[in-house]
Each structure stands twice: as structure tokens, then as C-alpha cells.
Amino acid sequence: MEDVITEASPPSRFLEEDLNTFTPPSPPVTPFPSLHFPQQQPLTPKLLIIALSPISLSLFHPHLLPPSVPLLASLTLPNTNPITLSPLTPNSFLLSVPSSIPSHHSHAIAKTLIGHQIRPDSVLVFDSLSPSNYRGRLPSDEAVAFKLDTSAERKAAEGEKILEGLEYYPSGSVVDGLAAAFLARCQLLNLRASLCVSWPEFDRSVMALIERLLRNGVLRGCDGLRFGSQVLRFGRKKGRGFESELYS
């Protein structure tokens, strides 16, 4: 009697090319980001501020208008505006990301920029809070902001933290995309880093909150620093706050 479990299966009645007709075509290979970094040596700022959210991009908009400041580096992906690096103060740089970045590029971008070409002492990331990633109900008419820190930042003494007076992101809530990749990269390199997520995505009260955090914190004493007053939308597609790629 034949053993139906261990017996070799009979040959398929279909040809190989016939089976392939039911297989969806492979997605096209996306070109890797193109980095333009004219510096001979890695940059070593004391502070690197990364603006991902529309609010933070609006706040730093006066520093993104050419020819106000020279660009130190730029990184370009297909169908997106370039990521640019520019000086903000003598000791701090601004990395602006004006377009949504595909999730499969996030860790590659974070690894390319932090630790190789840019070696900061500390990193501050601004991103929007995604309602689909938040455990709880967000107020519709109230500005809120939370932070996540690396282990090195948590060990910093009071009065020396990057974001003073800001509550931690509630347990059970998640962060994804480029913001999470930057924070993970800083954790891997044992860098002091904080991620600030804010809500609503487009609101002047959030802009005022972030400006106050900066002027009373890491940018204290930078009186000549100009901040934007208009909330700009920077072409974010389909509202990043409502399309999470965490489980895709």
C-alpha cells in the first residue's frame, strides 16, 4: 500500500509558463536615494534638528529659503522633494524632509545620514502624531505633544535634557516611518536623541508650543533665530496622520 504522506507528488499537469500567469508581476526596483555631500570630512554638530512634520517645516521655513543659507548636503529620492541639510546656528544643523518617504527607504536613509556623513552629539526629531498609532482619543481643538527618548538621553541630568517639561508618549502607542528609523539609529549608536510628536498636524497652537520648547530649551539664547508664523502644508499626500504603514 502506498504511503500518501511520504510518496513523491505526481508531476504537475500545468506548464511552468502557465503557472506564472497567476503570479502578480514583481514591483519595479526603486532607485536608491542619491546623496550629494560635498564635504571631505563628516560633519560633527552639537545638535541636529530633523524636521519631518509640516509644523516644524513651517517653523523653520525662513531658514530654508535660498539664498539665506548655503546647503551642506542634499539627498534625493524619485518623485519627492530633496532632503536638505543646512546650518541653523554655529553649533546646530537643520535636516528638512519636505515629502513623505517610502517606508522601505527609512532605515537606509537614517543609516546613510547619521553616523557616517553626520556625527552629531545629540538629535532632535519633530514629527506629526498619527491618530491611528495613538492609544486613546486625541482632542480635536487642543495642541498636544509627547516625546520619546533614547537610553542615553534618559540618563541625562535634569536641566540638560533636549526636551524639558514634555510628557512621554503613552504606553501602547507606536511611532513608525522615518521618525522611528532615526530614533532607532540613534539608539544603536548610543546617541542622545529625542523624538517629539505633536497633534493636530496643521495648527498654529502646535507651532507656538514647539517654538516655546525650542526657545526655552536647546535653542535658548539664539535671539537672532527667525521662526515662521504661517502654517504651510508642504505637499504631504493623503494626510500622513491617517495612513499608517506600520503593518504593511
Describe the predicted segments one by one.
Residues 136, 141-248:
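C-terminal folded domains that constitute the principal catalytic or ligand-binding module
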